[in-house]
């Protein structure tokens, strides 16, 4: 999605891009803007962006502006700035973003050789669920698949405007990537849910962390907390899904983007300050 938005901005002669971000968008915008020789301005909620994501934006040379407010306030600001100044907005309100992101649905279809029965996906600004549905519909209308998936969107309980059908003024969740109270793509997401006979559900932070741990311990997959919302949601709603259904859960971010969460939320054994000798290490290993 971002490579499409940046490429079109470059094509149109843009010299700078801007976005509001909970972390992932800023990292992506900064990377592609740098590759395209453009400046990248990113507005983030001060103190509410995972360090791994902030590090990416900084390394790519983004001009980071941390505000006293949440993502939704940052988005309001960048939307207004992009209307009055020579910067291109690359949040998912930019239609080119969704045109790029929809190709993820193409990849799923090509891998499975059909659409899944269910697609489970985290929702923050709701660009992904909107774009995936766009992609599935395009393949269906082109008669490349025989069915469409039910779109299942999951939000953190403390940040679930689509689930509760209201703006959340002060969203809060451990899953920082989806800590958004007023998603810009809400109408598109609701349309995806309704057209597909899907549903939206909320999952608690505890449910997210439990799924996060399961992915690491049982599947060897290290994702960021927001990604685990799709697994948490599936586990929470599995009784409503028929046996033998083909289900795809989308994981939207690598765990290294939020290392603090990993350090604080794991069941691993970590013994430190050990003496450097065979006897101590053998004992620590339980032999």
What would you call each of these model-derived segments?
Residues 1-16:
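Helix-rich "cap/lid" substructures immediately adjacent to catalytic or cofactor-binding pockets
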Residues 121-124, 149, 209-213, 220-238, ...:
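Substrate-binding/catalytic subdomain of NAD(P)-dependent oxidoreductase enzymes
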Residues 69-86, 138-223, 264-287:
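Active-site/ligand-binding loops adjacent to catalytic centers
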Residues 18, 26-69, 73-80, 163-168, ...:
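Active-site-proximal loop->helix
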